[in-house]
Amino acid sequence: DEFVGVISTARPINELKELIGKLNKSQEELNYYKEEFFKQISNNSSFNNIIGSSRTLKDILYICEKTSKTTSTILIRGESGTGKELIAKAVHNNSTRHDKPFVRVNCASIPENLLESELFGYEKGSFTGATKSKPGKFLIADGGTIFLDEIGDMPMSMQVKLLRVLQEMEIDPIGGIDPISIDVRVIATTNRNLEEMIKEKTFRQDLYYRLDVIGINLPALRERKEDIPDLVEYFIKKLNIKLNKNILGISNDALNLLQQYQWPGNIRELENIIERAMNFCDEKYISSFYLPSYLKPTIENPNKFDLDKDNILPFEEYE
């Protein structure tokens, strides 16, 4: 007689389901910690996290690192989208004030009639509706850094008051009796030609010299195109997390198109284009197919780029 049998080593179905659940949970935890790690890198904004290896950028970062150890006023100049706020945060985070507030004020976005109270605060009862006192941005930034974005858009009436603050290091809240002493480092930015504004008498020359103790000029992206590959790699890694993608890089033909373009929107426009491409790309590498048409030479003239404004992606002004 012959006996035939079957030996089964199958695990119970519930045990397999439990194992799959643990694997999924581990993947979710891994994604969470990766995202939190990237947030910490972005928030720290140290000089090591400013992307690029061009000689121009290295020279700027050398100046920034030296000046981060001082308390002198800094004026950062550059086109929209060149990363002026990123530089300002890096200077603050590498200074002795790194554990104190970094307070941002956009001088272009606050109405003229509200700018004084926003900067210097007000006392209870100083005007109709002032039911309680409110500290201004300068007082909130005491001990730290105040970042005056788009200083070229500050009204002349406020420029003289800011000049006094820089000279005396004290503020006068609206409705207050006595001035309040402050200890604040001022970092200002602009994308405007302040020298021309001084000639046109729309910007005070004495304020300009108070702000421009340390002047930092950020180049446009078209002036440091050798940094584009590093920036693209950085944005792909960053956006893989945001978009839940696993794109490995960009093709040579696509990268060549990016390096030929003039980048009126600078780094913010580059990030915008990479994010757009990654939303549609289902391959491992971003090819030129996924780039907007205005980056590509026209058929009639292979050296001319289609700059029809209707084809250009909108992008927010970024500092």
Segments (PLM) and residue ranges:
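Nucleotide-binding/hydrolysis machinery
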Residues: R55, R97-K100, G175-R185, R192-N303, ...
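Conserved helical "switch/dimer-interface" subregion of ABC/ABC-like ATPase nucleotide-binding domains
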Residues: I63, Y122, K161, V165, ...
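Bacterial C-terminal helix-turn-helix
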Residues: D306-E319
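Sensory-domain boundary capping and coupling elements
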Residues: D1, I7-A10
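AAA+/SF3 P-loop NTPase mechanochemical coupling elements
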Residues: V103, S133-G143, F147, P155-K161, ...
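Short gly/ser/thr-rich secondary-structure transition/capping motifs
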Residues: G125-K132, E168-P173, E196
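Flexible nucleotide-interacting loop at or near the entrance of a catalytic core
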Residues: N14-T73, R77
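Conserved post-Walker A coupling segment in P-loop NTPases
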Residues: Y62-G129, L139-P155, A220-K225, I273
